[in-house]
Amino acid sequence: MNLETLYSSYFNDLYRYLLSLSCNHFVAEELVQETFFRAFLHLEDNEIENIKAWLFKVGYHAFIDFTRRKNKKNALIEEIKGLELLDNNTPENQFIERDQLSQLIQSILTLPEKESQAILLCDLHQLKMHEAAEVLGLNLNTLKSHIYRGRKKLKTILEKRGILHEEG
């Protein structure tokens, strides 16, 4: 598969993932460019079975490198810009969806890093568990534990914030 085909096939998914990590439209775009640049450099050298998981892993490492360079380990969440929403929604519904997604991502990012990354990859970006485990460099069972604990903590956080109502 050539780079142009990869770009058109995976740009949106990769952009959304990197936006959820960086919480900044411009940083996400820069990271997507960096990811595809790295892919260009290494694509022909490696035989890659699952290209989407590999691109997400490259993107994740580009984000880590960016964070280290900018010393933003504890960066606060900025306003989420440019999220693509369904065209058939009214502007009011789009605003509500964007606000709810923003609150959800803010809540996810309060979790420990491995738990938040596992939830972002599996639940928000719908990677299969084995793909997410590969991206994060974790054993599959370890990833499942992070997802379980993260979802449990996330439910508590969302209930406390009044976003999710307690059952019962």
Where are these regions (language model features)?
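Residues within the DNA-recognition helix of helix-turn-helix
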Residues: 10, 146-149, 153
